[in-house]
Amino acid sequence: MLHTGFAVPLDRANVDTDQIIPKQYLKSIKRTGFGDYLFDSWRFLDSGEIGMTPNERRINRDFVLNEAKYQGASILLARDNFACGSSREHAVWALQEYGFKVVIAPSFADIFYTNCFKNGLLPVSLSEQEIDALFLYAMQGSRIEVDLEKQRVSVKDQPEFYTFEIAENLKKKMLSGMDDIALTLSQSELIERFEAMHRENQPWLFRE
């Protein structure tokens, strides 16, 4: 996975899942349609309802996502402890439907981090100092490149880059596009070999 795009800097720490997608929009039985309500209480000055589009709302021009220069951004820069609070997979769906492919922050809530990989949204953890540098580049309109294979983030036409850690199984999942079941099936030969060895070494466990 190699993604290049513009980034929007959300300069707020401890953003919780209710701020990402408010609970009143979770009544929908569909998995789609949540992007219109991303950061709802910050993007809009009025109260929305399920089915309302942004064109029917009062836009908060002072919120960073509504600034003209950040329209079309595909990378979200955030601060520490992003997506804390209650567990809701809708938070990931809303970010993806809005157009984000990557979220970069110093840290993420564990459940949100896991949900990202289940849905193909890449969460990248960098230091606060590295995030600060990316904030400046984002505000200048620089394009940011995220290379999952090499595990690094760089800025177009700039020499420096920032490396990030990711578990090998999660990296493989993102690069292959496989879900948990597909990943398990890809290891079927090893699983069968283990089961045969287990049955041979501890046969009493398999007696009826």
Predicted regions mapped to residue ranges:
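Cytosolic catalytic domains that perform sulfur/thiol-centered chemistry
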Residues: 1-79, 83-208
